[in-house]
């Protein structure tokens, strides 16, 4: 299962952590995903959605 939002396609991002002594260490940032039941094409389906999509109302939740 890929750590990607199925609504906005937000995924893993890589970059550097920079310490006070200016050392650079590679790391990754992963999106804050939730597995929710949502209405997709008229049927309820479990999808991975980032919390920004949930808060902004881009996902119609299935109850």
UniProtKB/Swiss-Prot annotation:
Name of the gene encoding the protein in the UniProt record: rpmB
UniProt KW Ribonucleoprotein keyword: yes
Alphabetic keyword roster: Ribonucleoprotein, Ribosomal protein
BP terms from Gene Ontology: translation
Signal peptide: none
Any Pfam family: Ribosomal_L28
InterPro entries membership: Bacterial_rp_bL28, Ribosomal_bL28, Ribosomal_bL28/bL31-like_sf, Ribosomal_bL28_bact-type, Ribosomal_bL28_sf
PANTHER family hit by this protein: 50S RIBOSOMAL PROTEIN L28, LARGE RIBOSOMAL SUBUNIT PROTEIN BL28A
A molecular function GO annotation: structural constituent of ribosome
Record-level GO cellular component terms: ribonucleoprotein complex; ribosome
UniProt family annotation: Belongs to the bacterial ribosomal protein bL28 family.
UniProt name for this protein: Large ribosomal subunit protein bL28
Species annotation: Alkaliphilus oremlandii (strain OhILAs) (Clostridium oremlandii (strain OhILAs))
Zinc keyword on record: no
């Amino acid at each position: 299962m890929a750590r990607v939002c199925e609504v906005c396609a937000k995924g893993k991002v890589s970059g550097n952590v920079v310490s006070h002594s200016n050392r650079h260490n590679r790391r990754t940032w992963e999106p804050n995903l939730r597995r929710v039941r949502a209405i997709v094409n008229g049927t309820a389906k479990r999808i991975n959605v980032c919390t920004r999509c949930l808060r902004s109302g881009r996902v119609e939740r299935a109850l």
